[in-house]
């Protein structure tokens, strides 16, 4: 996380700390409306900025899988050297990111944590999207499997018209809603053990919604949370879904993309995250939820 982003979030947190919402139905409704305004993405956009004609994620995923690739270029950002594709089908054009890297290394150390086996995999993008949907977390752009130029990989819809979170004039109109999205991010990153979250893989769209991309270094086979101390405020919907999720549902969501050891460690991190939240509730009460 860059110094600029840290300063930005610190400023937003200060604003949030100064705001109180009435403990009334009207007050709660106002707060809910603010959050909905900041987090709803409406329609996905094409390269021309116009909404794409997809009524659901399933329709968009089918397009990503089957549309013709009419253009491709390298994306000069990131470790895995993804490609930007232009897809076209039935007169509809959309851009997408295609990742195809599959690298496994032994005995890797990152930020003080040792990984006996470390995998950098495009398949983790699909796992992150499917797990996010299972949690009710609308923060990971639709992603699916795809082949291009003989290479198997993942293809993810492009977030058009993004804002620069590190620009000096960046101001989220609803600081509470914006900061809550970063709390969702911390919860999710702990669950999937995402060791590579940085400003280049967080996208802010024009509605000030955060989109989380580039999860190729998540899901490492380590039965530990990433940084439990960062989980301090909890999205009740995500918490409820995680708590009610059984191991079969978890396995079904990610088994096409994770191996047995990675799934076992993910299940253990789920348990640790549940324990973390239960400890927070015991200490601070139901106020930890939003």
Task: Label every PLM stretch briefly.
Residues 9-95, 260-290:
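Regulatory N- and C-terminal appendages and interdomain linkers associated
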Residues 65-173, 189-194, 206:
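Conserved ATP-binding subdomain of kinase catalytic cores across diverse folds
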Residues 85, 98, 181-218, 266:
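Active-site acidic catalytic loop and adjacent metal/ATP-binding pocket
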Residues 88, 117, 204-290:
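C-terminal catalytic region of ATP-dependent kinase domains
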Residues 166-170, 197-202, 223-224:
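A short secondary-structure junction signal
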């Amino acid at each position: 996380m860059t110094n600029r982003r840290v300063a930005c979030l610190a400023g937003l947190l200060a604003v949030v700390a100064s705001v109180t919402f009435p403990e009334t139905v009207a007050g709660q409704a106002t707060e809910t409306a603010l959050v909905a305004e900041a987090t709803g993405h409406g329609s996905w956009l094409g390269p021309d900025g116009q909404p794409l004609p997809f009524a659901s994620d399933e329709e968009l995923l089918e397009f990503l899988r089957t549309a013709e690739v009419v253009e491709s270029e390298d994306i000069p950002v990131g470790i895995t050297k993804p490609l930007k594709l232009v897809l076209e089908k039935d007169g509809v054009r959309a851009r997408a990111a295609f990742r195809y890297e599959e690298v496994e290394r032994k005995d890797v150390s990152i930020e003080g944590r040792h990984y006996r086996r470390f995998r950098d995999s495009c398949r983790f993008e699909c796992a992150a999207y499917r797990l996010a949907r299972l949690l009710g977390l609308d923060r990971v752009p639709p992603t699916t499997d795809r082949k291009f130029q003989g290479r198997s990989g993942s293809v993810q819809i492009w977030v058009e018209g993004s804002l620069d979170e590190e620009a000096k004039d960046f101001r989220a109109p609803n600081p509470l809603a914006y900061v809550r999205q970063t709390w969702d991010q911390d919860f999710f990153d702990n669950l999937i053990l995402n060791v590579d979250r940085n400003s280049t893989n967080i996208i802010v769209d024009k509605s000030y919604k955060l989109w989380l991309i580039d999860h190729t270094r998540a899901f490492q086979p380590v039965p530990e949370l990433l940084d439990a101390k960062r989980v301090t405020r909890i999205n009740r919907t995500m918490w409820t879904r995680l708590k009610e999720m059984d191991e079969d549902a978890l396995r079904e969501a990610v088994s096409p993309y994770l191996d047995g050891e990675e799934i076992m460690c993910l299940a253990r991190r789920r348990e640790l995250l549940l324990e973390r939240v239960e400890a927070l509730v015991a200490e601070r009460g139901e106020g930890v939820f939003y």
